[in-house]
């Protein structure tokens, strides 16, 4: 049974691959290429080229055959390498998009350090007068409150990593609303954009371990989509993908 099946497969294979030499293999590939093309999606001109490529021996005149072969070599090259050229164009386009985005971000508002707000008026002015595209993250703290020092240190690092985000801090006693920000709710994080409060987290240190660092705060804010993608990370990721391809 197995021998009969094997013999049948061999006969089928031999019936399909009728050419044995190097030129025969090429012609078999050309024929397969033609047969595998979807007749509804292939332009008539391309089908004619592939059909002619599949049987170059049909021409009788030697000079015509040579000219035809040269022509087909060019057409064949174009067909084979068209997809690769499209991939290269796509990579260039993606790289250009990332560079454009990086340039736009570079020319936008940039901060790079933590702003200490001294009064409630300064706090309100920062929120109301900052550009609408800017995300403002405010830490309301008080000296001696657990987690406040660690959060201030984390802000210092994140302000460098995300220069397009404005990181601020203000003591609860300076807000003019001390009764709203008692020690029970500190440290508190408030996030604004376009003059509107978009997120607030009271006693935010409870979200972290006993000891926490900038990376923990970054991950927490990213969970809520409050931080943009880092510029250097976006460009490095694109370059890495291109190197792999």
Swiss-Prot record:
Pfam families: Phosducin (PF02114). Keywords: Cell projection, Cilium, Cytoplasm, Nucleus, Phosphoprotein, Sensory transduction, Vision. Residues 59-68 have a biased composition (Basic and acidic residues). Residues 111-245 are annotated as: Thioredoxin fold. GO terms for cellular component: cytosol; nucleus; photoreceptor inner segment; photoreceptor outer segment. It is found in: Cytoplasm, Cytosol; Nucleus; Cell projection, Cilium, Photoreceptor outer segment; Photoreceptor inner segment. The modification Phosphoserine is found at residue 73. Gene3D superfamilies: Glutaredoxin (3.40.30.10), Phosducin, domain 2 (1.10.168.10). Light-induced changes in cyclic nucleotide levels modulate the phosphorylation of this protein by cAMP kinase. Residues 1-14 have a biased composition (Acidic residues). Its main location: cytoplasm. This is Phosducin. It comes from Felis catus. The gene is PDC.
């Amino acid at each position: 049974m197995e021998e009969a099946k094997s013999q049948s497969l061999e006969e089928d294979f031999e019936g399909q691959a009728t050419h044995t030499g190097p030129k025969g293999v090429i012609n078999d590939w050309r024929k397969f290429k033609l047969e595998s093309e979807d007749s509804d999606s292939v332009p008539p001109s391309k089908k004619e080229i592939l059909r002619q490529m599949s049987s170059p021996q049909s021409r009788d005149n030697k000079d015509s055959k040579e000219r035809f072969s040269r022509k087909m070599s060019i057409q064949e090259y174009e067909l084979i390498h068209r997809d690769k050229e499209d991939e290269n164009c796509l990579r260039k386009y993606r790289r250009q998009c990332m560079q454009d985005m990086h340039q736009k971000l570079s020319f936008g508002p940039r901060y790079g350090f933590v702003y200490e707000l001294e009064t409630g008026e300064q706090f309100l002015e920062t929120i109301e007068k900052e550009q609408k595209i800017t995300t403002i993250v405010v830490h309301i703290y008080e000296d001696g409150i657990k987690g406040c020092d660690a959060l201030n240190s984390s802000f210092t690092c994140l302000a460098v990593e995300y220069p397009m985000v404005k990181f601020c801090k203000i003591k609860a006693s300076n807000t003019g609303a001390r009764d709203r920000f008692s020690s029970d709710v500190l440290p508190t994080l408030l996030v604004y954009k376009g003059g509107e409060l978009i997120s607030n987290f009271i006693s935010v240190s409870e979200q972290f371990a006993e000891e926490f660092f900038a990376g923990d705060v970054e991950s927490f804010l990213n969970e809520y989509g409050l931080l943009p993608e880092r510029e250097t990370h976006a460009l490095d990721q694109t370059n890495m993908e291109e190197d792999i391809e």
